[in-house]
Amino acid sequence: MSGRELRHGYTTGACAAAAAAGAARMLRRQELADEAEIVLPRGERVAFRLHGQEFTETWATCHVVKDAGDDPDVTNGAEIHATVRREALNRPGARTMVFVTGGRGVGTITKPGLAVPVGEPAINPVPMRMITEAVKAEFSVVCLPQILTVTVSIPNGEELAKKTLNARLGIVGGLSILGTTGIVRPISAKAWTDTLDAAIDVALACGCRTLVLSTGRTSELVVQGALAGEHLREEACVMMGDHVGYALRACARKGAEQAVLAGQFAKLLKIACGHEQTHVSSSELDLRLLAEWIAATPAASHLASLVEGANTARQVLEASGNDPALMELVCSRAREAARLLAPSLRIKVLLAGYDSTVLYFG
């Protein structure tokens, strides 16, 4: 690899949790706070600088300026605000409750198929949990039960959302509060391909002839668990991200014998559709092609109606009840698409469920 190592950043979810933690701290202690520390989903402790701090006896507010590191993220520099309000809960046996809602610049879900129900603010489950836990932790030492309401807002979120695919997905009025790890990894193409080359070289040098190419950290963890009994070496796991075509060709060029493609349904469907680059800026998922495949496959014909009204690939999979015919159809086509990109490689495909289980491997 050449050049400096790219700097990682933090997700909107991590920033929202930090802002909520800071506001909760000021509200409870009735004093200004300059920073707030939160625990990310994988256990890392990170401190965020706070801005715009205000508090009274009943509410407090502040914001965190999102730093996406060297990732070309449209939300880089955005102000992620959180306001925490409290009211006493005068009921015998009551416990403190935390409610999280979206304010100005946070979108609302209007179509099914996403991780958040229709009508709810576009705050994904992991950030929602991070925000709730951060506020609960601050008030855990308070004996008097209270109702704590957290409002997350992004002042220019509606304008920024126009630069994303949110509207197409049915997220209206603003941005989504996202993140599963709290950390944004840079997606610079040169950085990724340099990293891929180095990782593949290391794996082969360690004697690995089967390499696991994952689209993200979640699918990587799933495949590591699934293949734990096969003495899978850590070096064999290569996070290819969205660079499917490059990773497969590099494996073949460098002498690997087999590759296991590991990803969730939407990513594998993109691979099946022939996309060598699966990032949203480079590839659009057209469910009409999936509908054509289903129509041409007798074993999957019962799934046709599910695709007609679907908004996302995830919605199709979940509505099918993880139907084996659907998974076989998409995974087999992903496998064939991968073979076209790297004919010398033996290819297997692992479909990681949205609940981190193995849905298909073959």
Curated annotation (Swiss-Prot):
<dbReference type="InterPro" id="IPR036074">
    <property type="entry name" value="CbiD_sf"/>
</dbReference>
<dbReference type="Pfam" id="PF01888">
    <property type="entry name" value="CbiD"/>
</dbReference>
<protein>
    <recommendedName>
        <fullName>Cobalt-precorrin-5B C(1)-methyltransferase</fullName>
        <ecNumber>2.1.1.195</ecNumber>
    </recommendedName>
</protein>
<dbReference type="GO" id="GO:0019251">
    <property type="term" value="P:anaerobic cobalamin biosynthetic process"/>
</dbReference>
<keyword id="KW-0169">Cobalamin biosynthesis</keyword>
<dbReference type="InterPro" id="IPR002748">
    <property type="entry name" value="CbiD"/>
</dbReference>
<keyword id="KW-0808">Transferase</keyword>
<comment type="pathway">
    <text>Cofactor biosynthesis; adenosylcobalamin biosynthesis; cob(II)yrinate a,c-diamide from sirohydrochlorin (anaerobic route): step 6/10.</text>
</comment>
<comment type="similarity">
    <text>Belongs to the CbiD family.</text>
</comment>
<keyword id="KW-0949">S-adenosyl-L-methionine</keyword>
<keyword id="KW-0489">Methyltransferase</keyword>
<dbReference type="GO" id="GO:0032259">
    <property type="term" value="P:methylation"/>
</dbReference>
<dbReference type="GO" id="GO:0043780">
    <property type="term" value="F:cobalt-precorrin-5B C1-methyltransferase activity"/>
</dbReference>
